[in-house]
From Swiss-Prot:
It holds the Pfam family Cpn60_TCP1. One of its GO terms (molecular function) is ATP binding. Forms a cylinder of 14 subunits composed of two heptameric rings stacked back-to-back. Interacts with the co-chaperonin GroES. This is Chaperonin GroEL. It is found in: Cytoplasm.
Length: 540
């Protein structure tokens, strides 16, 4: 086992604070509408330019092991805030730095660290309750666009696009961000159920100009098995041919003579058919087939429940207004499933989301809800260069998370104003002893730090502006973009309550642990192996 280096008391805390400050100072230059960019060097390719706090935090590793521990703990604050709300990472870092700096001053002055932490925790619990009282629901497109704009660093086009996307696919819809091909940002909305499986044979294509298969009012056969024998299919094909409608087959696979026969039938114009593989794998495939069945009003032909393909009739088929299939996606538009059944299925999947333990499962279930309930929107980010594209895509993703958080828990006045108002409401809060009162004061003073940093980044004097904002009430604050005072809601400067709440909670949690640190242990750097000199031998 390697030898350890151990530091105690003030020595340890001073080193830790130095690390905290290096990371926080690098992150906080990005805060607010006049925050600056940070350039991150990469081992290959062009440097990354970002205004995203968590991206900056993740890059920082310090040479001194003790300082690095301090920096890594604050990095945890930014990461946790990012995971919980998808934004607010810079605010969380600024709050943590302030609580740690003021808290360690109090410890150096002889306060009891445990009581300080209790005071900080008490203030944060009270502050979260006050934030919830200040919160206003965010339901209209205008408010959603404003939240998106602020989070995308005052880029109004991004805010507008996100608001449009949410309007089209609903609050439950899936919105994804992709790199576009042009200079302009674009929004693509896919209505209906889309999944990532294309046609099994290019001979099914009936729209050569677009390279797609389009079926109008088709029957949809859903089979949870491989189909390789055409005999099983004959009764279904005959029934569909009589009805004079096209047929879409969604099965585990269609191969061999079955696929060949379907192709021949299509080319001769006997029955218009297309076949695709079912989406997903294993149990997820079964669930997604069931989703498609619910959406189209059909039944999954599965041997597990004693159904055979040969005995399937038209009543087992699903139907839709239109189906479009290209090389790697299938879209089912306007399935004929009953509204009540679809809603029941959505409720059932939501229940599974509540119980899901892994993020991956939760995300996949969320996608299934969106496909049944809303639709899918794709935001294509346009930029002139690769470097700008990466930076912009990260901003758009942040803005998307922020708008989701706003819809979930509502919004409060932005620009650091909500926390200043909360702090003034808690001015009379008291703990059980003087040290706890100091802890409460540390937390309340920290709540001013985001506003101070926004003002400082805008090149103004933080104390003057903070006092002016404190003298006002309600949503009265300072717009750093235009350098004027007024109602933050009227200015369109809104922050999601969830983002502000998460930033405060995670900052206080980690800062409290750091204030109560008395000892730090790390590996000693490994020295070079001693030089043994030349070995003894025969002279001359």
């Amino acid at each position: 086992m390697a030898a350890k280096d151990v530091k105690f008391g003030n020595d340890a805390r001073v080193k830790m604070l130095r690390g905290v400050n290096v990371l926080a100072d690098a992150v906080k230059v990005t805060l607010g509408p006049k925050g600056r960019n940070v350039v991150l060097d990469k081992s290959f390719g062009a440097p990354t330019i970002t205004k995203d706090g968590v991206s900056v935090a993740r890059e920082i590793e310090l040479e001194d092991k003790f300082e690095n521990m301090g920096a890594q703990m604050v990095k945890e604050v930014a990461s946790k805030a990012n995971d919980a709300a998808g934004d607010g990472t810079t605010t969380a870092t600024v709050l943590a730095q302030s609580i740690i700096t003021e808290g360690l001053k109090a410890v150096a002055a002889g306060m009891n660290p445990m009581d300080l932490k209790r005071g900080i925790d008490q203030a944060v619990i009270a502050a979260v309750d006050e934030l919830k009282k200040l919160s206003v629901p965010c339901s209209d497109s205008k408010a959603i666009a404003q939240v998106g704009t602020i989070s995308a660093n005052s880029d109004a086009t991004v805010g507008e696009l996100i608001a449009q996307a949410m309007e089209k696919v609903g609050k439950e819809g899936v919105i994804t961000v992709e790199e576009g091909t042009g200079l302009q940002d674009e929004l693509d909305v896919v209505e209906g159920m889309q999944f990532d499986r294309g046609y099994l044979s290019p001979y099914f294509i009936n729209k050569p100009e677009t390279g797609a298969v389009e079926l109008e009012s088709p029957f949809i056969l859903l089979a949870d098995k491989k189909i390789s024998n055409i005999r099983e299919m004959l009764p279904v094909l005959e029934a569909v041919a009589k009805a004079g409608k096209p047929l879409l087959i969604i099965a585990e696979d269609v191969e061999g003579e079955a696929l060949a026969t379907l192709v021949v039938n299509t080319m001769r114009g006997i029955v218009k058919v297309a076949a695709v593989k079912a989406p997903g794998f294993g149990d997820r495939r079964k669930a997604m087939l069931q989703d498609i069945a619910v959406l189209t009003g059909g039944t999954v032909i599965s041997e597990e429940i004693g159904m055979e393909l040969e005995k399937a009739g038209l009543e087992d088929m699903g139907q839709a207004k239109r189906v479009v299939i290209n090389k790697d996606t299938t879209i089912i538009i306007d399935g004929t499933g009953e509204e009540a059944t679809i809603n029941g299925r959505v409720t059932q999947i939501r229940q599974q989301i509540e119980e899901a333990t892994s993020d991956y499962d939760r995300e996949k279930l969320q996608e299934r809800v969106a496909k049944l309930a809303g639709g899918v929107a794709v935001l294509k980010v346009g930029a002139a260069t690769e470097v700008e594209m990466k930076e912009k895509k990260a901003r758009v993703e942040d803005a998307l998370h922020a708008t989701r958080a706003a819809v979930e828990e509502g919004v409060v006045a932005g620009g650091g104003v909500a926390l200043v108002r909360v702090a003034s409401k808690l001015a009379e809060l008291r703990g059980q002893n003087e040290d706890q009162n100091v802890g409460i004061k540390v937390a309340l003073r920290a709540m001013e730090s985001p506003l101070r940093q926004i003002v400082s980044n805008a090149g103004e004097e933080p104390s003057v502006v903070t006092n002016n904002v404190k003298a006002g009430e309600g949503n009265y604050g300072y717009n750093a973009q235009t350098e004027e005072y007024g109602d933050m809601i009227d200015f369109g400067i809104l922050d999601p309550t969830k983002v502000t709440r998460s930033a405060l909670q995670y900052a206080a949690s980690v800062a409290g642990l750091m204030i109560t640190t008395e000892c730090m242990v790390t590996d000693l750097p490994k020295g070079d192996a001693p030089d043994l000199g030349a070995g003894g031998g025969m002279g001359g």
